[in-house]
């Protein structure tokens, strides 16, 4: 073994395997491009993005970790969303109030 060596497994890796997916259209109504990262709670994304934030509650983009989707001004774009996993708690963005998404206290 060589330090830092990476051993790859066989076959393809499916991201978000088994996750329920939601598809919606997003339009950037602003005058500058907006990028949204892979683990951002989508309803809290830039206010210039026009989409159904209520339907997107508890979801993030269905893209590989560490990547982002760029929304150009005035361009409609269809994206797939997946539910946030883990404890389903969101802190530090603009959710009011911050905390659990599923109503548990």
Curated annotation (Swiss-Prot):
Name of a matching Pfam family: Urease_beta
Gene3D superfamilies on file: Urease, beta subunit
Keyword match Cytoplasm: yes
GO MF, one annotated term: urease activity
Catalytic activity: urea + 2 H2O + H(+) = hydrogencarbonate + 2 NH4(+)
Keywords: Cytoplasm, Hydrolase
GO biological process: urea catabolic process
Main location: cytoplasm
Compartments it resides in: Cytoplasm
Residue runs in coiled coils: none
GO-annotated cellular components: urease complex
Pathway note: Nitrogen metabolism; urea degradation; CO(2) and NH(3) from urea (urease route): step 1/1
Enzyme Commission designation: 3.5.1.5
Family stated for the protein in its record: Belongs to the urease beta subunit family.
This protein's name: Urease subunit beta
């Amino acid at each position: 073994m060589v330090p830092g060596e990476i051993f790859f497994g066989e076959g393809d890796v499916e991201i978000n395997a088994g996750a329920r997916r939601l598809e919606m259209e997003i339009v950037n109504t602003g005058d500058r491009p907006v990028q949204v990262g892979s683990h951002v709670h989508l309803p809290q994304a830039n206010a210039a993005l026009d989409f159904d934030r209520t339907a997107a509650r508890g979801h993030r983009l269905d893209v590989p970790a560490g990547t982002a989707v760029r929304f150009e001004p005035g361009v409609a774009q269809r994206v797939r969303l997946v539910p946030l996993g883990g404890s389903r708690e969101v802190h530090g963005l603009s959710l009011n109030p911050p905390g659990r998404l599923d109503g548990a206290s």
